Regions:
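A broad, low-amplitude sensor of folded, mature protein cores
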Residues: 30, 49-54, 71-85, 101-103, ...
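Short, structured motif recognition centered on aromatic/hydrophobic residues
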Residues: 3-6, 14-16, 48-51, 97-101, ...
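Short, tandemly repeated low-complexity microdomains enriched for cysteine and small residues
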Residues: 15-20, 25-32, 60-65, 74, ...
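A cross-kingdom feature marking solvent-exposed beta-strand/loop segments within repeated
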Residues: 13-48, 118-149
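Intrinsically disordered/low-complexity terminal segments and short unstructured peptides
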Residues: 2-4, 14, 24, 34-35, ...
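Generic structural motif
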Residues: 9-11, 19-21, 42, 54-56, ...
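Conserved functional hotspot residues at active sites or interaction interfaces
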Residues: 1-9, 56-106, 136, 156-197
Length: 197
């Protein structure tokens, strides 16, 4: 199940559409307050959620899953950014599935490199994502023992869904997601002026 949380300074309406799956819905939100929207079950083929709003909004989505014995788990996923260079780390003992989303109106490419825990590159691939579409692959497709994934490319957002075979085999609910972290250097400008007095 998915719940969308939205904050905006002014009231308006938004369209929520699942990328990779059919269907969209329109919702109203109120200004200067948090609005919670129940999106129901996540479609099986969905890779991302695209939000189009009347005004500037801050949004995140909470995804939950139920397991055996009334056990459940959830993940809070913030809005993704498109950075020219970014990376994500896959915790030891977990498997990662990389999802890349193109919310633009034109096809775009991203070059991705996998690194092991010693910082050595173990594999790379370039993927092309059509406009308004998404692509996904297992981090292990980049090579053995992938500990981190780095990406170069403009206009694409991506992240890694984590999973554990031990959790799945125990029929427990487990859901986790790591968004890409920008690697672009922070810049700051300092103005200096001579004191003429």
């Amino acid at each position: 199940k998915a719940t969308l949380t939205v904050y905006a300074a002014g009231s308006g309406s938004l369209t929520a559409a699942w990328v990779g799956a059919a269907g969209q819905s329109v919702h109203q939100y109120s200004g200067d307050r948090v609005t919670t929207i129940d999106l129901g079950d996540v479609p099986k083929d969905a890779s991302a959620l695209k939000i189009t709003a009347d005004t500037k909004v801050t949004a995140d989505v909470t995804v939950s899953r139920d397991g055996n014995g009334n056990q459940s788990d959830f993940a809070l996923i913030g809005a993704a950014q498109t950075d020219d260079r970014s990376a994500a780390v896959i915790p030891s003992g977990l498997d990662g599935r990389v999802s890349v989303v193109n919310a633009s109106l034109s096809s775009k490419q991203m070059h991705m490199t996998g690194y092991d825990d010693k910082g050595a590159a173990v594999g790379e691939k370039t993927i092309t994502v059509d406009a308004g579409a998404a692509a996904s692959f297992d981090a292990s497709d980049l090579g053995k023992n992938v500990f981190a994934v780095a990406a170069d490319g403009k206009g694409l957002a991506w992240g890694v869904r984590l999973s554990s075979s031990a959790v799945s085999d125990a029929k427990l609910a487990g859901i986790a997601y790591i968004g890409a972290t920008p690697l672009m250097p922070l810049q700051e400008r300092i103005w200096a002026r001579s004191d003429m007095t």
